[in-house]
């Protein structure tokens, strides 16, 4: 009889453990701030309410409207509705559509949503965001007026980006996103884009491949600076490995020589920006323009001093390249 009682107790505890491990930790999630604002940057934790709407047996549509749709309505109505076209627009640009897909959001791949949310709660996201935004405000010469939402979505495609500084999103369920790396290392990268955008828009060649290369490379370099160079250069550039970095260094001269002719291209569809499509360097382990931009910016700072990275905000992409003497460096390789 004692053995039977003990077996039943083990089974009950095991059953409870399984249920707990296969559901959201609503108590921890509820403690996360709805939003965090430092100066002109606001980060909305929309995913919090998307989860809490499912806390009770009956789905709470009011939370979705009040805490998910309305706080960043411009993102849903404008950015998502436009990106995914007329067929999907009604999912995002009205309350009814938002409630409908959020109701069934976790019906499929719920374990994946739970695992990613667990990653977020273990990071202590409130502390992380606050400290990052405070440090960012001390470092940069200009504070963007920006809204960024951390969210789940039924159709992923933005990743970490958006339509403008007021319509930015991090899709937590996007399969291409490494949640831990993006939250801990990716935020400074994206924030620097928002700062540089203000100055880059004054460049008549702002849509050139070179401009996009400097933009991405500068964001990577800023990440390196943001973490006081306590991360490696290759980690700052798309979180690549040492092996990836070594491949780029080995092929540095050839990369520059073969991509230089595309610097003025305005199409956005060229081997420098889309090596994945054009296969100019089929063996390249990561994105060419991120790495090349980082190298150009690095050479600029190497020439003008450790704080000279701040100059780049007010320089055109052509000026950064010319002043860096990167081409002269390449010619000597």
Language-model segments: which ranges?
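Acidic helix-start/capping segments at beta-turn-to-alpha-helix junctions
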Residues: 68-79, 150-157, 318
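Acidic/His-rich structured neighborhood in mature extracellular/periplasmic domains
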Residues: 95-238
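C-terminal motif of bacterial Sec signal peptides marking the signal peptidase cleavage site
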Residues: 14-15
């Amino acid at each position: 009889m004692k053995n039977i009682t003990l077996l039943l107790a083990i089974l009950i505890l095991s059953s409870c453990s399984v249920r707990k491990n296969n559901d959201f930790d609503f108590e921890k999630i509820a403690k996360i701030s709805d939003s965090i604002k430092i100066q002109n940057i606001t980060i909305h934790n929309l995913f919090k309410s998307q989860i809490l709407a499912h806390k009770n047996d009956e789905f709470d549509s009011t939370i979705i409207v009040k805490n998910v749709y309305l706080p960043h309505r411009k993102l849903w109505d404008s950015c998502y509705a436009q990106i995914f076209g007329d067929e999907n627009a009604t999912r995002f640009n009205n309350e009814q559509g938002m409630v409908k897909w959020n109701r069934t959001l976790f019906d499929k791949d719920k374990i994946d949503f739970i695992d990613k949310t667990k990653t977020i709660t273990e990071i202590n996201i409130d502390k992380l965001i606050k400290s990052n935004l405070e440090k960012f405000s001390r470092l940069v010469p200009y504070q963007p007026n920006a809204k960024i939402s951390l969210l789940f979505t039924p159709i992923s495609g933005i990743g970490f980006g958006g339509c403008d500084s007021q319509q930015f999103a991090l899709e937590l369920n996007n399969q291409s996103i490494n949640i831990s790396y993006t939250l801990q290392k990716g935020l400074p990268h994206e924030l620097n884009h928002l700062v540089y955008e203000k100055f880059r828009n004054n460049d008549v060649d702002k849509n050139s491949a070179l401009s996009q290369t400097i933009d991405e490379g500068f964001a990577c370099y800023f990440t390196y600076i943001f973490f006081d160079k306590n991360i490696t250069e290759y980690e700052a550039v798309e979180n690549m490995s040492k092996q990836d970095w070594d491949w780029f260094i080995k092929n540095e001269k050839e990369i520059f020589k073969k991509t230089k002719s595309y610097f003025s291209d305005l199409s956005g569809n060229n081997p420098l920006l889309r090596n994945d499509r054009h296969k100019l360097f089929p063996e390249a382990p990561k994105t060419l323009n991120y790495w090349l931009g980082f190298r150009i910016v690095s050479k600029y700072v190497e020439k003008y001093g450790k704080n000279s990275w701040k100059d780049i905000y007010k320089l055109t992409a052509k000026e950064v390249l010319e002043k860096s003497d990167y081409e002269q460096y390449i010619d000597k390789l």
